[in-house]
Amino acid sequence: KLTWLDKTFNSVSIIIFICLMIPQSFVLPVEKMKKSDYNQKSYWYYPWGKSGTHKGVDIFGKKGTNVVSPVRGFTFATGNGKHSGKYVIVLGPKLRFHYFAHLNSINTNVGNWKSLGEKTGTIGDSGNAIGKPAHLHYSIVSWLPHFWRIDNDPQGYRKMFFLNPIEFLNDCFKN
């Protein structure tokens, strides 16, 4: 007879397996963005302010430009942080969190389904980006660790969770 713990473990395992098997389609997270709107070397740039290492990419654009969901998924969180400013987190396929920070406006609510390319907010300069050129800070964080990504870079152990968004952006420009 299966115990409550066995049933829970089996259920969670099935959910994780299904989430990992869902194919991921990806579109650019900023409307009408160009490859020149982001720096190819900005991911894991060190040193980078209070965080030590830049764990994403900054995509520069005109304040108010639409930020869209690059994947299908659920709005996991929204808020306004001291450093991030206005932010949105979308949970997409492969149990990956897509993090959008320094927004000027938020156009979604927690629990909302986001379709591919659906507006989530607008480029801004909120949080510690006040007084700097308007941009979107975009990160992709895996819920499951990718141990093979750990290296000797500063905070390199954290690479098991932070994926390089520039690889995804560059793939969009190849098509």
Question: Regions from the language model: what does each represent?
Answer:
Residues 113-175:
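Conserved, short, structured surface segments that act as functional micro-motifs
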Residues 69-107, 133-137:
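Zn2+-dependent peptidoglycan hydrolase active-site motif and core
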Residues 57, 65, 98, 106, ...:
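Glycine-centered loop/turn positions within well-structured domains
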Residues 38, 43, 99-100, 138:
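Aromatic side chains
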Residues 2-86, 115-116, 125, 162-175:
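Surface-exposed, glycine-biased beta-strand/turn segments
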